[in-house]
Amino acid sequence: MLNNEYCKRVYDKVLARDPEQKEFHQAVLEVLEGLEPMVERHPEMEKAGLLERFVEPERVVTFRVPWTDDNGKVQVNRGYRVQFNSAIGPYKGGLRFHPTVNLSILKFLGFEQVLKNSLTGLPIGGGKGGSDFDPKGKSDAEVMRFCQSFMTELFKYIGPDTDVPAGDIGVGAREIGYLFGQYKRLRNEFTGVLTGKGLSYGGSLARTEATGYGLCYFADNMLKNAGRSFEGAKVAISGSGNVAIYACEKATALGAKVVTMSDSNGFVHDPNGIDLALVKQLKEVERKRIREYVTVRPEAEYHEGCSGVWQVPCDIALPCATQNELRLDGAKALVANGCYCVAEGANMPSTPDAIAYLQSHGILFAPAKASNAGGVATSGLEMSQNSLRLSWTFEEVDERLHNIMVNIYHSAAATAEKYGMKGNLVAGANIAGFEKIASAMMSQGIV
């Protein structure tokens, strides 16, 4: 609920302008609620129309993507790139290929990305893009033809100093390779225009692990500040993609026992601890569903549907699957089962009422824009390596990532305390990220 009149007017304009964009509304409301204390202290923002400009993308590109399937039939998908804010650097954000992709989802992701990128301390703005194309069930040749068609339009709007996309759901190393190859072919340039690249052509060590590792580094700092740790804790993780897999790996390395993982069909509960090598084989090599886990580990249980993952008793919950996966009923189950920490690995995985419930019950809560910033932080480090024409070791990148995540935690915590909301990392992260962007936007005039 908004109390500041200026914030209310800005939010009402967002609702009126794009009434159907529910995900975007949710993201804007959550951010404006967190920014109210700062807006109260800085009336000059209203005169400059700062919030109105902040919630409106600088540019939205929509385009058709025609491609031919293996049967020779022409297919047409829709492509997008939302270039949200470049006040502190070139647009930076992933590409998502999934049937559910629409403009509302990409605007919410791009909006969150602006603040997340600011929090890293790196000079990168925010954006997001993708398509309603579904790579699942497609041959490598079909995926290649789609990616080449997609890049044939997108290349006009991106560049190493303009907009640097990366991967997201449905866009992994294979897709990034095809996209990069087509960009290089069209521009006749070898530049760091994409991140998440293969190591043989400009990628960074530790990029694959970065979001999951960074999530655990952030959560570890939050836990230590509260006198707790991962050591001996039981952890519930949702998802089985990059974020979930490497969050599982790092949580285990920090002494925890991970007992759940999921995909879009259901989840597995392994009370003896998830066999991560098996999950990697199933998901990264064989591209199979998580249900196959129990055929190798019969002591584990498979359950249809994803929401039940939060009914499993745990100490720490790491939602790493997709937006709005952790709802109020899941939050209530976590609290009832003694969970004391929730750290978001996916983008906006918790609904507002779930977050409010967790916070009201004293649960340590890490918002995605802070806790899952490790991926884009390491993308920024990949951009730096590309610009310098060198490669850092895994340990060098991991150390820089760890330092960035520690700094993000301390920045969010200190900012929350500064504005009288000690412990509220949601508000702290929003304000800490916005302060830098607001300063840059005010300095650059009405643009």
Stretch-by-stretch model annotation:
Residues 98, 117-231:
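Glycine/serine-rich phosphate-binding loop and adjoining beta1-alpha1 elements at the start
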Residues 2-27, 222, 335-447:
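Adenosine-phosphate binding glycine-rich loop
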Residues 63-124, 128, 132:
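Phosphate-interaction motifs
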Residues 203-311:
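Glycine-rich phosphate/diphosphate-binding loop of Rossmann-like nucleotide-binding domains
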Residues 44-75:
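Structured beta-strand/loop patches that form or line metal/cofactor-binding pockets in enzymes
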